[in-house]
Amino acid sequence: MMSPKIEKQTVFVVDDEKIIALTLELILIQKGFDARSFVDPLDALYAARIVAPDLLITDVVMPQMNGIELAIHFKVDCPNCRILLFSGQGATNDLIQNALAQGHAFELLAKPVHPDELMETIEQILHSSGSRA
């Protein structure tokens, strides 16, 4: 008798700094996630149409599209996807306040972050009963 296959949770990481995106992807893979990294938010949006992720981790300040705009697109295209914003930029507060004023609330994690803190936050988001996105 075969044991049931446990589905890996899919996590998309979007950061315009390639080294950060790849590092987070590797950490998540080591922790058992199906992680995919993107430096272009539009590539992540396209990929989500093929495989909807369980979680989107995105930088906030990026040149092509900011992370809040990306998160709002994900909320429409992938309503079950949880979202974690990730930023080290001071300008983030204004963007977050603007999103809140438009009715969008997101979790925010400050860069740099220790991998243990990242994993703890991811577990809380993925296992919370209500949608945090």
Question: In which residue ranges do the predicted regions lie?
Answer:
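Non-catalytic signal-transmission and effector/linker regions of two-component phosphorelay proteins
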Residues: 1-10, 116-133
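Two-component/phosphorelay signaling modules centered on CheY-like receiver
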Residues: 18-36, 103
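Short hydrophobic/Thr-rich beta-strand motif most characteristic of the beta2 strand and flanking loop
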Residues: 32-39, 47, 109
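Acidic catalytic/metal-coordinating carboxylates
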Residues: 39-43, 66-70
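Active-site beta3 strand of CheY-like receiver
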Residues: 51-57
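Receiver (REC) domain active-site loop signature in two-component systems and cognate sites
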Residues: 62
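Alpha4 helix (beta4-alpha4-beta5 surface) of REC/receiver domains from two-component response regulators
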Residues: 69, 90-109, 116, 120
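Hydrophobic/aromatic residues positioned on beta-strands within the core alpha/beta folds
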Residues: 86-88
